[in-house]
């Protein structure tokens, strides 16, 4: 709870253009007022609870995201921000479908269930599923160098682990996520029937982390899945001794596009209204969670910053605008 308050305070203070070494009494009093209001009167957790518990997951193109859109707009209107509006755009519609199935199939080893989630934007297998021998790669470059004949009709497993030694998790994520975003398309190009990707996470449990993958328009598409950490370890260990076969089944599919809206609210600048400071978050989330951390928190923080400044009597010279973006995830 303290972390959310500190983030709100930091965002609020950063919008007040003062130098601490030459701070006037008025500046100090304003910061003290913001601190007290953020700690004592914060509404952010109340809004976040409604967003996550009452509305829930908010994937683009779903009724839940539309509900979150109108809830956020109504909230900013009730707070009497100077301007509140919706910015229309087109968003993709992707359906996960039935619960995914994935298991190792071996006459010698038996059958082992693997924990998977279909990647966002991916196609399904249909009701019969697909089965193939697994080949393991640790980079897109390694797969690129393989002869297509070695990949054809195989299931490619991208097994490069999360870089746990990295000081910043964002850097570790960035150094690993390429195999999820671009790996399946490359595997499809080389003739694979499906792709598995080690979840992009430092967690050592077996909960797969979904995320988006991208296929170019008109490109051949294959089913692709995020694989839980423990399932990834198991598959890698078994496949190290001799190639194993895996069966996958999913019914996910793309359903075109539909209308979506960015939600925008602002405090209009008194002196330079056309110079705009933007803060924001993305309102959408994946379909298998509540989207609290990613990124409901960023949305309610942005609204709360404007509320704090307004309720404290702060009159910005430049426009301060909060934008809740509608489609970051896929």
Regions found by a protein language model. Name each.
Residues 49, 53-155, 159-167:
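Noncatalytic luminal/extracellular "stalk/propeptide" segments of secretory-pathway proteins
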Residues 26-62, 207-212, 284:
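N-terminal capping segment at the start of a domain
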Residues 162-163, 201-202, 283-285, 323-330:
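Acidic, glycine-rich active-site loops and adjacent beta-strand->loop/helix elements
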Residues 139-204:
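A conserved hydrophobic secondary-structure block that centers on an alpha-helix together
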Residues 29-30, 105-107, 113-117, 121-148, ...:
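Soluble metallo-hydrolase cores and metallopeptidase-like ectodomains found primarily
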Residues 46, 307-330:
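Short helix-loop-beta-strand segments that form the rim/entrance of peptidase-like active sites
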Residues 26-30, 43-47, 55, 64-72, ...:
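Stable alpha-helical elements in mature extracytoplasmic
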Residues 1-26:
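Bacterial Sec-dependent N-terminal signal peptides
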């Amino acid at each position: 709870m303290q972390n959310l308050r500190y983030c709100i305070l930091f965002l609020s203070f950063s919008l007040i253009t003062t130098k601490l070494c030459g701070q006037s009494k008025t500046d100090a009093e304003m910061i003290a007022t913001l601190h007290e209001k953020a700690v004592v009167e914060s509404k952010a957790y109340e809004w976040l609870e409604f967003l996550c518990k009452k509305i829930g997951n908010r994937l683009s193109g779903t009724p839940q995201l539309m509900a979150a859109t109108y809830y956020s707009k109504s909230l900013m209107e009730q707070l009497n921000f100077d301007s509140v509006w919706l910015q229309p755009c087109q968003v993709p519609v992707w359906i996960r479908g039935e619960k995914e199935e994935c298991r190792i199939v071996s006459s010698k080893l038996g059958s082992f269930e693997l924990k998977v989630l279909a990647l966002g934007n991916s196609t399904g297998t249909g009701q019969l599923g697909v089965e193939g021998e697994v080949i393991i790669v640790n980079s897109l470059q390694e797969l690129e160098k393989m002869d297509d004949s070695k990949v054809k009709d195989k299931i490619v497993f991208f097994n490069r682990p999360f870089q746990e030694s990295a000081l910043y998790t964002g850097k570790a994520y960035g150094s690993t996520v390429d195999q999820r975003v671009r790996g399946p398309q490359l595997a499809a190009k080389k003739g694979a029937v499906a792709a598995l990707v080690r979840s992009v996470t430092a967690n050592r449990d077996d909960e797969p982390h979904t995320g988006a993958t991208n296929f170019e328009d008109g490109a051949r598409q294959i089913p692709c899945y995020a694989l839980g950490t423990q399932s990834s370890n198991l598959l890698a260990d078994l496949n190290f001794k001799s190639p194993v076969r895996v069966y996958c089944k999913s019914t996910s599919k793309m359903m075109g596009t539909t209308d979506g809206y960015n939600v925008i609210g602002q405090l209009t600048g008194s002196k330079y209204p056309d110079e705009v400071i933007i803060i924001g978050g993305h309102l959408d989330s994946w379909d298998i969670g509540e989207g609290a951390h990613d990124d409901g928190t960023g949305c309610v923080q942005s609204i709360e910053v404007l509320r704090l400044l307004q309720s404290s009597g702060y009159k910005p010279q430049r426009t301060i605008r909060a934008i809740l973006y509608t489609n970051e995830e896929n």
